[in-house]
Amino acid sequence: TDTVSISFAPNNDIAWNNNHGETIDPAIAAALVAGFHTGVIDADAPDTTPWNYSVADADLDFLANGESITFSYTITATDSEGATDTHTLNFTIDGTNDAPTVSATAATGFTEDIDASLQQLTDNGTVSFDDIDTTDTVSISFAPNNDIAWNNNHGETIDPAIAAALVAGFHTG
């Protein structure tokens, strides 16, 4: 009975299909390649040994929907007489569309002057956004919630023209 040694090696052929000509960060490429493992290294023939591949989801978050990464390993079996055989194991990882994130600074509020006829009320803040899919473009838009309330202690409702003017006062840019 021959003892067979199993070894594997990455083929250094990692490719990112992203239509933007970008290359994979070397640290991420190293994490992707390090994800492959085999079980038994030396065994009496005939036998089988399991393999597995595992990579942290965070290492793939940059990969957008429609993009893929391909790479391969060569598995070599060497018997006790020195004869060898090889097999190439190919991997393809397909990306998904990770949702963008958005946040905004809260409005600080302001108080109308007693004589507000010439007063310009203003407030400002920032909208922060990100998308871990590195090739995605993020568009920011806003829509009013139609929840303008008038606290006047008389039960009156706000005039629709005034509500529209309040909504029109918000803009980005």
Report each predicted region and the residues it spans.
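Extracellular interdomain linker/stem segments of modular secreted and single-pass surface proteins
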Residues: 92-99, 133
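Extracellular ectodomain surface segments
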Residues: 1-32, 101-171
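Acidic, turn/loop-rich segments in luminal/extracellular domains of secretory-pathway
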Residues: 20-93, 114-117, 151-173
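Residue-level signal for well-ordered, solvent-exposed loop/turn and beta-edge residues enriched
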Residues: 83, 99-101
